[in-house]
Amino acid sequence: MEILKKYLGAIAIFLLSVSTFGQTTDNIQKAFKDSYTNEYKANYSGAIADLQKVYKADSYEMNLRMGWLQYEAKQYAKSLDYYQKAIDLRKYSVEARLGYVKPANELKKYDKVYQTYEDILKIDPYNSVANYWVGVSYYLVKKYDIAVKYLELVVNMYPFDYDANHMLGWIYLGLGRSADARIVFTQALYSRPGDASATDGLSKCK
């Protein structure tokens, strides 16, 4: 009889935990849904409050979402903290790092922005966003021979992308490769006809 009581007690505890888990999951889903609704209305403080009701510091998804909402609310320091927590929870997360660079850029933490893009490339060497911006960083300090490798990779993956072709054109000009610059500037103008910067670049191709 004593064994039966213990067995029934264990079943009761299990059923209670399952029920609690179901209620918790429902509450979390509702909080996310409500936060999306408020975000759509540009009520970012409301969206943050919705998620705060169920927030757990060890939840990757909640930290990622809070990072985005705080960024939308222009609370850049808080956004940075939440994205960092998400990165700490999922060390190979590219999406959290791409989120992180947004508030870091607004706070003018350019060293962190650059390092984060480099970290992304260690995880995902073909990430187009990271390759583009690392290439731009090298272009800005006139290291065209390094910058070209990053932008050529992006253009090879996205041949009709305006930004990549446009940037690669200026890098080619920096390297004295006018014929190559002409090709990609022309491609950029197919994507964005009449663009002033691409037109200017094309005019410099001898």
Protein language model regions, located:
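Structural marker of alpha-solenoid helical repeat scaffolds
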Residues: 55-57, 89, 123, 157-158, ...
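Helix-start (N-cap) detector for alpha-helical repeat units in TPR-like alpha-solenoids
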Residues: 28, 60-62, 94-95, 128-129, ...
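Structural signature of tandem alpha-helical TPR/SEL1-like repeats
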Residues: 40-49, 72-85, 95, 104-119, ...
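Terminal, low-structured helical/coil segments at or just beyond the last alpha-helical repeat
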Residues: 25, 174-206
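Bacterial Sec-dependent N-terminal signal peptides
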Residues: 1-28
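Alpha-helical segment of the N-proximal tetratricopeptide repeat
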Residues: 26-56, 61, 65-72, 102
